Each structure stands twice: as C-alpha cells, then as structure tokens.
C-alpha cells in the first residue's frame, strides 16, 4: 500500500510485487520441505544410512527458510526506504511491513539454525536476520 503513493512508487511497487510472488512460491515449497526429514527419521536407528540421510534432508530442508530470510530482509529494506521517503500518510503501513518482514526473517533464520545447528548456512541466515533487524530499526527511525 505505501508503495503506491511514494516518489519511488513505480520501482518499489514492481519490486514489492516480485518479492510477494517469490514469498508465495517459497511458502508452498516450505510446506513440503520437511517431509524428507521426517521420512529419514523414521528409518530404524540402527540403519547405517540413517544419520547421513537425516543430515542431507535437514540441509535440503534449510534451503527454503534461508531463501525466505533473504526475501524477508529485502522486504524489510524496501519497507524501511518507503517509511523514510514514501507518502507520510502511509508511513505506518511501511513500518508495519518492516516489522512483519523482520519477524519473518527471524523465524526463518531460527528454522535454519534448528535444522543445521552451525555452519556457513546458519551464519548466512543469521546475517539476513540482522539485515532485516537493521531495516526495521531504520523504518522506526532508530
């Protein structure tokens, strides 16, 4: 909504639409991403391939929340820009967008950390959550 009335409306509106489309795609992917993990966990505990299959499934299942964190960070940054430069009557909408995007980035980052415990993907997800956090602060004027 805030993108419809700002000086940067055309590019912001277009990018927001692209991000919305990607977020919806990722939500659909995320619905099914954990199924292979559950299947691997159902293998007998003494199966020699169980640990490797669980690990591989968790790594793969972490890709969609990582991408969700990436999209959410960009949404938060776009919302922060709109909060600062957009139509003053819609600043609240932009701030709400930044807050929601930051929450999505944090949640997605936590899912990655839960699945993988540590490593470069966890660090990347945490960095994306921090980007969203900084954007939220900018949107709030902090």
Regions from the language model: what does each represent?
Residues 2-43, 136:
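A structural-propensity feature for long, helix-poor, extended segments
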Residues 7-10, 46-47, 77, 93, ...:
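Acidic-enriched, low-complexity/disordered segments with a strong bias for Aspartate over Glutamate
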Residues 12, 19-22, 26, 61-71, ...:
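Amphipathic alpha-helix face/heptad-repeat signature
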Residues 30-99, 103-109, 115:
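Amphipathic alpha-helical interface segments
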Residues 108-142:
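C-terminal auxiliary extensions adjacent to catalytic cores
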């Amino acid at each position: 909504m805030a993108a419809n009335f700002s000086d940067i409306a055309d590019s912001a509106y277009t990018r927001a639409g692209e991000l919305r489309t990607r977020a919806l795609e990722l939500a659909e992917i995320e619905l099914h991403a954990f199924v292979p993990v559950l299947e691997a966990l159902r293998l007998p505990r003494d199966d020699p391939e169980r640990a490797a299959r669980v690990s591989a499934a968790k790594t793969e299942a972490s890709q969609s929340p990582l991408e969700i964190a990436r999209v959410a960070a960009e949404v938060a940054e776009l919302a922060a820009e709109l909060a600062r430069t957009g139509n003053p009557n819609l600043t609240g909408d932009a701030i709400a967008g930044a807050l929601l995007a930051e929450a999505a980035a944090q949640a997605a980052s936590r899912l990655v950390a839960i699945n993988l415990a540590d490593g470069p993907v966890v660090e990347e997800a945490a960095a994306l959550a921090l980007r969203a956090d900084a954007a939220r602060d900018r949107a709030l004027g902090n």
